[in-house]
A protein has these predicted regions:
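Basic/polar N-terminal segments that are highly enriched at the extreme N-terminus
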Residues: 1-11
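Short acidic-glycine-tyrosine-enriched beta hairpin
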Residues: 7, 29, 58, 65, ...
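A short glycine-rich, His/Asp/Glu-containing loop-to-beta-strand
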Residues: 13-49, 55-56
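Short strand-coil-strand connectors
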Residues: 17, 69-71
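Short, charged/polar surface micro-motifs in flexible loops or helix N-caps
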Residues: 29-32, 41-45, 58, 65-67, ...
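Ligand-binding loop in jelly-roll beta-barrel domains
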Residues: 79, 87-113
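Acidic/histidine-enriched, glycine/proline-rich intrinsically disordered or flexible terminal extensions
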Residues: 117-133
Length: 133
């Protein structure tokens, strides 16, 4: 496990379903404990409703205003605010307005961040390719 920051290592990048992912800390660097990435999401964009069965997720909004749907309840989250999305709970979000939003995501345990790189490389789409996802 590499516990020191490595400024010479560039973040891994992936663009999947119109969202740009910049993975700044992955499972390799953390020994599987966490995954950290910054996402740039298009205006009015966001993922379909989904569930993480193994990972807890914390999202901090850096730019824009988001609306999160978490287990049937709507939570507005503005720049500078955070939300916790526990594993096993259906959720989604969308960026409010036409301008892109940026958020920092922390997943624990790590590993799911690699999903975005693989999904982008395979050009998988949701919900069309849900069986492959």
């Amino acid at each position: 496990m590499n516990i020191a920051a490595n400024p010479t290592r560039a973040p891994r990048r992936a663009v999947w379903m119109d969202t740009d992912y910049s993975i700044t800390l992955g499972t390799y660097e953390s020994g599987g404990l966490v995954g950290v990435f910054v996402s740039t999401v298009p205006g009015r964009g966001g993922p379909p409703v989904h569930v993480h069965h193994n990972e807890d997720e914390a999202i901090h909004v850096l730019e824009g205003e988001y609306e999160f749907w978490l287990d049937g309840q709507i939570h507005p989250v503005a720049a500078g605010q955070s939300i916790f999305l526990p594993r096993g709970v259906p959720h989604t979000f969308r960026v409010m307005g036409d301008r892109p939003g940026r958020n920092l995501t922390i997943l624990t345990p790590g590993g799911l961040e690699d999903f975005f790189v693989e999904a982008a490389a395979r050009d998988l789409r949701m919900p069309a390719d849900m069986a492959a996802v």
